[in-house]
A protein has these predicted regions:
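Membrane-interface aromatic/basic loop that binds lipid-linked glycans or pyrophosphate carriers
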Residues: 284-333
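Glycine-rich, basic loop-to-helix element that forms the pyrophosphate-binding segment
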Residues: 21, 66-82
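Short, well-formed alpha-helical segments that are part of the catalytic scaffolds
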Residues: 13-27
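A conserved acidic beta->alpha catalytic loop
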Residues: 39-50, 91
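Catalytic metal- and UDP-sugar-binding loop of GT-A-like glycosyltransferases, i.e.
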Residues: 67, 90-92
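Short loop->beta transition adjacent to catalytic acidic/histidine clusters or analogous donor-positioning motifs
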Residues: 2-5, 26-37, 58-62
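Donor-binding/catalytic cores of nucleotide-activated saccharide
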Residues: 95-108, 113-202, 206-218, 229-242
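Short aromatic/hydrophobic "clamp" motif used to bind/position activated sugar donors
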Residues: 87
């Protein structure tokens, strides 16, 4: 049995992306881990590359080829086959720092935590130099201690999962992610909290909020573990005709976890930022097919509908950041 299980869902990733990702995993200082690669119905070329690269870079690994069912089902399948005490997820086009598993092991051996969070940093694809990034991360964040979260800390982290706003969970350009990445989750907890396969968008935030709704022991290491590579052809960076529908699905899933005034304000802050992004990424995009007049009417109609209107209480304004207040005046007033 391995101490860690690294689960990598893959769907038609490029060979170079996977090679960089797999290489960063093979360079881990701590070696007691297994790798489970879930091929979520990739084309034949990608499937062959997965098999070849897994054999090249990994010692203990398992490749599972399935039909395309989405990333949530792929991750759940990985959880099913994992044998490690703790599970961590890595996307097939990202890279991790060599100290990640060693850092986690040293803390988890000392404290019986359900979840241990590390730091993630976003890097644009055109700035990518894998060896340089890993070396900088290792030197810059050489020393770190675990911040064990009390009830107040867990509440702060819960709020952070709505809008990534809490300074306690940031360090330089690094931050605790709302995705499943850059964190170690006890296998028994992951098995009881599988990803919602019905959600096609916003499944990451929903999963994190659900995990934190459990009575858990958690800690945070303010050390860079993970590089999220922002790629131009990523689904998150392409024009989507279903942009509004997908974000409505995501925000609706998050709204279910609003439990008090503070989380309501964090939800409002997140919805305001989505509304801001809606203008350049959808209505003002060169691919938008409608007229500007139609866009104006549709946009202002959205503001009055759920989930965009949720949390839109004038009493919440005082809790927003300066940027949030400006966005509120622009989009909600």
């Amino acid at each position: 049995m391995s101490f860690f299980s690294i689960i990598i869902p893959i769907y038609n990733n490029k060979e170079k992306e996977m090679a960089d990702c797999f290489a960063s995993i093979s360079q881990q200082q701590y070696k007691d881990f297994e790798v489970i690669v879930i091929d979520d119905g990739s084309n034949e070329t990608c499937a062959r590359n997965i098999d070849r690269l897994s054999k090249r870079f990994f010692t203990r690994y398992r490749v599972i080829h399935t039909v395309n069912n989405g990333v949530s089902k792929a991750r759940n399948l990985g959880i099913k086959y994992a044998v490690g005490n703790y599970i961590t997820f890595v996307d097939g086009d990202d890279i991790i720092c060599p100290c990640m598993l060693m850092d986690a092991y040293q803390v988890l051996q000392k404290y019986d935590l359900d979840i241990l969070y590390g730091m993630l940093q976003s890097v644009k694809e055109d700035k990518l130099n894998c060896s340089r990034l890993v070396n900088i991360a290792y030197k810059k964040y050489l020393f770190s201690t675990a911040d064990l979260l009390d009830i107040e800390g867990l509440e702060e982290l819960y709020c952070h999962m709505f809008d990534i706003s809490q300074s306690r969970f940031k360090c330089g350009k690094g931050y605790v992610s709302r995705g499943p990445i850059a964190k170690m989750v006890k296998k028994s907890l992951a098995e009881r909290n599988l990803f919602d396969e019905k959600l096609a968008f916003g499944e990451d935030e929903e999963w994190n909020l659900r995990l934190l709704s459990n009575p858990i022991r958690a800690g945070v290491i303010k050390k860079l573990w993970y590089y999220y590579i922002q790629r131009k052809d990523s689904t998150l960076h392409r024009f989507r005709t279903d942009f509004i529908k997908k974000h409505e699905e995501r925000l609706s899933a998050m709204w279910k976890y609003v439990k008090d005034k503070k989380t309501e304000c964090c939800y409002l802050n997140e919805s305001l930022h989505v509304l801001k992004d809606l203008l350049p990424n959808y209505y003002f995009s060169e691919f938008y097919q409608g007229s500007m007049k139609g866009a104006f009417i549709e946009y202002h109609s959205l503001l009055k509908q759920f989930p965009w209107s949720a949390g839109c209480n004038v009493n919440n304004i005082i809790y927003l950041s300066v940027k949030g207040k400006v966005l509120y005046i622009l989009f909600k007033k």
